[in-house]
Design a protein with these regions (language model features):
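Flexible glycine/acidic-rich beta-alpha junction loops that bind and position SAM and/or redox cofactors
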Residues: 1-3, 93, 190-195, 228-236, ...
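Radical SAM [4Fe-4S] cluster-binding motif and immediate context
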Residues: 62-218
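Short, electropositive alpha-helical surface patch
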Residues: 143-153, 232-252
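Radical SAM enzyme core and accessory elements
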Residues: 289-363
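A structural motif corresponding to the C-terminal end of an alpha-helix
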Residues: 9, 122-123, 210-222, 248-254, ...
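Glycine-rich beta-alpha loop elements in corrinoid/cobalamin-binding modules
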Residues: 1-51, 269
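Structural recognition of alpha->loop->beta junctions
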Residues: 2-24, 174-180, 242-266
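Glycine/serine-rich loop-strand microenvironments at binding/catalytic pocket rims
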Residues: 206-235, 341-363
Length: 363
């Protein structure tokens, strides 16, 4: 890594997790000492010691003693954390998030339970917003079993999976799960295959419909992540997504429901970046002066690169179409968009047994 332009907004970055190193960084800065010898810390002028195989210390419990809870912005105290270290699938062609997590360290259910119980008791926090990339169900179920009598509410992020059965969702609900995030991304089998999204691409919609119905029956609010503008994606394939939302909206829209619409970006370090020709990418401007952080300007044989303003405008129109399907009360669309992807969304799902953005109520 030799791109100094990465440091336009910060002085240094931990390339791999190092809890003890973070503590040492604070001590060194406080004492006016150099930081260049801290493991896994990288800066333009001091390269440190990069250790890809360094395990992180799970026993570290966050300390929030310096937070003035009386001035807390949200109506209830919410702790943001994660249960797992990395995505258990880690095969999506568009994603580079796990490219710097080469060790498959598994989180300890026992330690996660201990952490949450400690924070719950010490800080009187009863809401936990877990931002996992994709939490394995075995870990989630073990955690749920350990905290089901703690009277806490929590959110979980995972993948669409046939292991998300009604029985599994019931156990999670009984342990306080209020919100489930799923990286749906698309529903067209060809696009899903190009994404390498799952090993059941042709059954994807059927499994998704079942998960949606079962989550709604368990009073669990949903949030989807969706990618538009994947190279070679056509309007017909985008319409397939719209038709899917129309088919499922009576189920998913009974509870507060939100979607994050992401415009595709070519990510440095992703399988797509390494095998560009396979995806019709004929040019990627990967010189250090051509991009900020990890999204790389590119061109495709389909003339659909998302750096093109006309392409962006067309994709934006599709986002409005999708939103129009999912939010029936049009006057509330700005509120729906502003709440999405925030703890306010989580709190809405915690307390609302109906969808205020639609006209449905649960039986």
């Amino acid at each position: 890594m030799n791109n100094h332009n990465f440091f336009f907004g910060f002085d240094s970055i931990f390339m791999y997790r190092n809890d003890n190193g973070l503590v040492q960084l604070v001590k060194n800065i406080t004492n006016g000492q150099k930081v260049g010898e801290i493991d896994n810390l990288y800066s333009p002028n001091s390269f440190g010691h990069i250790k890809q195989d360094k395990l992180f210390d799970e026993t570290v419990i966050p300390n929030y003693d310096d937070i003035e809870w009386s001035k807390y912005f949200f109506p209830e105290r919410i702790v943001i954390d994660r249960l797992s270290y990395r995505c258990f699938w880690a095969k999506c062609n568009f994603c580079s998030i796990n490219s710097n997590k080469r060790i498959k360290q598994m989180s300890s259910v026992k330690q996660q339970i201990s952490k949450v119980k400690t924070l719950h008791e010490k800080y009187e926090v009863s809401n936990f917003w877990f931002l996992d990339e994709a939490c394995p169900m075995k870990l989630a179920l073990g955690f749920a079993e350990g905290i089901k009598h703690e009277n806490i509410a929590w959110s979980l992020r995972t993948r669409l999976d046939d292991k998300l059965t009604f029985e599994v969702l019931t156990k999670l609900k009984e342990a306080g799960l209020k919100e489930l995030w799923i990286g749906l991304e698309h529903v067209n089998p060809k696009i899903l295959s190009l994404m390498n999204k799952s090993d059941f691409n042709f059954e994807y919609k059927t499994i998704a419909q079942k998960v949606f119905d079962d989550a709604t029956a368990n009073n669990i609010g949903l949030h989807f992540c969706h990618i538009l503008g994947f190279p070679s994606e056509t309007d017909e394939q985008r319409q397939e997504v719209a038709d899917f939302y129309k088919m499922t909206k009576d189920s998913i829209c009974k509870k507060p429901f939100f979607t994050t619409f992401n415009i595709f970006g070519l990510m440095l370090g992703s399988p797509m970046f390494e095998s560009r020709e396979k995806f019709g990418i004929i040019e990627a401007l990967d010189e250090e002066s051509k991009f900020n952080m990890i999204k790389v300007p590119y061109k495709t044989i389909y003339n659909d690169d998302t750096g093109n303003i006309q392409v962006i405008q067309r994709l934006s129109e599709w986002i409005f179409r999708y939103t129009d399907i999912l939010v029936r009360k049009k006057e509330l669309i700005p509120l729906w968009m502003s709440i999405s992807d925030t703890p306010f969304e989580f709190l809405l799902k915690k307390y609302y047994t109906y969808n205020p953005f639609s006209n449905y109520e649960l039986d």
